[in-house]
């Protein structure tokens, strides 16, 4: 299960209603994992208000190094340090080693815990695997912005579910051997070796894509193919050629082209402050991609397989 919490949903200048960009993705399976995507000003306070412990954050993925997307890192790291964190914090992003080093120099932290900076490629047209464990993967791909910037894909790993009909077809009966099959991937029944893939169906993992700041681009479409949720830059209602951002119709077109299940628009300009503004944005986007929502601070999206 995946819980996505939007901590900040405005673009470059914050408003009283909207904080700078930050999104928490909580993944619950055999273990609980807390990942933060971007960390704008005020992120730690919104973490507190949301009831999510910043001490549980294991990894932070920065899309790019504009201040509205990373300026919350300095106070967040300081608070973790004051709260006597000991676990390593991993920070990913384009040129992360350089920027994280500068951030740590600025803070005079005297860190009691390790902070690891992980560089993410910011050129090319193919996704790159940047993080992986037994339960999920995180991929990145470069996008179109004024500075090196990337989109991220969180991908739950596919699972095998035992199909009882396939077991019957092999003339087998349910038994304790099935537990060994799940644990080891293979079991011997009546002198016959059974592999788990012989009696299982593949259950595709959940997929969430975060575009970061970008104009509409083919790389996001590629990364988001068939995703359960696409979180996309929707800064403007109307196209603005002078800005390296998407308008809401362009974002909806990306969602349609990628064949995603849901689209959430975020990174809205502060000019859109009324209910009527949000309704106009939703109406415009839904004409192209009906399953569209506009994010607001503390909004939650739950995904289940």
Model-derived regions: residue spans:
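Metal-dependent catalytic neighborhoods of phosphoester/phosphodiester hydrolases
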Residues: 72-80, 102, 273-283
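A glycine-rich helix N-cap at a beta->alpha junction
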Residues: 107-121
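Active-site metal-binding motif and surrounding structural segment of the metallo-beta-lactamase
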Residues: 41-92, 119-121
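Short internal beta-strands
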Residues: 89-96, 261-265
């Amino acid at each position: 299960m995946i819980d996505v919490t939007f901590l900040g949903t405005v673009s470059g200048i914050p408003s009283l209603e909207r904080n700078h960009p930050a999104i928490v993705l909580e993944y619950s399976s055999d273990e609980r994992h807390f990942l933060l995507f971007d960390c704008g000003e005020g992120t730690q306070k919104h973490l507190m208000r949301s009831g999510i412990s910043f001490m549980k954050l294991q990894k932070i993925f920065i899309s790019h190094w504009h201040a509205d997307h990373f300026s919350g890192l300095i106070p967040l790291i300081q608070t973790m340090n004051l709260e006597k964190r000991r676990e390593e914090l991993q920070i990913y992003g384009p040129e992360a080693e350089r920027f994280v080093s500068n951030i740590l120099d600025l803070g005079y932290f005297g860190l009691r815990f390790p902070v690891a900076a992980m560089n993410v490629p910011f050129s090319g047209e193919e996704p790159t695997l940047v993080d992986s464990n037994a339960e999920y993967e995180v991929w990145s791909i470069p996008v179109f912005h004024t500075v090196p910037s990337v989109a991220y894909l969180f991908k739950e790993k596919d699972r095998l579910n035992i199909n009882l009909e396939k077991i019957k077809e092999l003339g087998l009966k349910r038994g304790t051997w099935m537990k060994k099959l799940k644990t080891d991937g293979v079991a011997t029944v009546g002198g016959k070796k059974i592999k788990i893939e012989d009696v299982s169906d593949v259950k595709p993992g959940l997929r969430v894509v975060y575009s970061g700041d970008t104009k509409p681009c083919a790389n996001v479409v590629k990364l988001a193919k068939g995703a359960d949720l696409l979180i996309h830059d929707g800064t403007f209602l109307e196209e603005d050629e002078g800005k390296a951002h998407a308008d809401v119709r362009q974002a909806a077109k990306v969602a349609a082209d990628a064949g995603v299940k849901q689209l959430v628009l975020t990174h809205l300009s502060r000019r859109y402050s009324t209910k009527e503004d949000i309704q106009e944005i939703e109406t415009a986007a839904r004409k192209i991609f009906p399953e569209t929502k506009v994010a607001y601070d503390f909004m939650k999206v739950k995904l289940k397989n």
